[in-house]
A protein has these predicted regions:
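Positively charged, small/polar-rich N-terminal and surface patches that mediate targeting and assembly
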Residues: 1-117
Length: 117
């Protein structure tokens, strides 16, 4: 299993979440965050904004679905104007997943079945 974390512009978050839903991934965690990239924020005249608002989304997927989910995120998060600041995607391994209410340990087939439900 993999955790895909993506940081996107606030104005694109609903489009990305809908894209994930349409791709069969309804289970998403969303957190409002602030941060800056390599450009060190944004300058507007004499005003410098060190930290810019972004949204972070988390989704856990079977290994085999990684490229499909990344493509869904890219297709919906990119602004198309070629500017910096559209966000990042991070992929990391998930060793175990448990459902708190039941204590059940989930597996990749469980995640795949939830996607298809």
């Amino acid at each position: 299993m993999l955790m895909i974390r993506t940081i996107v512009r606030p104005e694109k978050v609903h489009e990305v979440m809908q894209g994930l839903l349409d791709a069969g991934y309804p289970a998403v965690t969303k957190i409002s965050v602030v941060g800056r990239g390599k450009q060190r924020g944004l300058r507007v005249g004499d005003v410098v904004y060190d930290e810019l608002p972004k949204e972070m989304l988390f989704v856990v997927v079977p290994d085999a679905d990684k490229d499909f989910v990344i493509r869904a995120i890219l297709d919906h998060a990119k602004t198309g104007d070629g500017k910096f600041g559209d966000g990042k995607i991070f992929v990391s391994a998930v060793e175990e997943v448990y459902t708190i209410s039941s204590g059940t340990k989930e597996t990749e087939p469980t995640l795949a079945a939830a996607k298809e439900a």
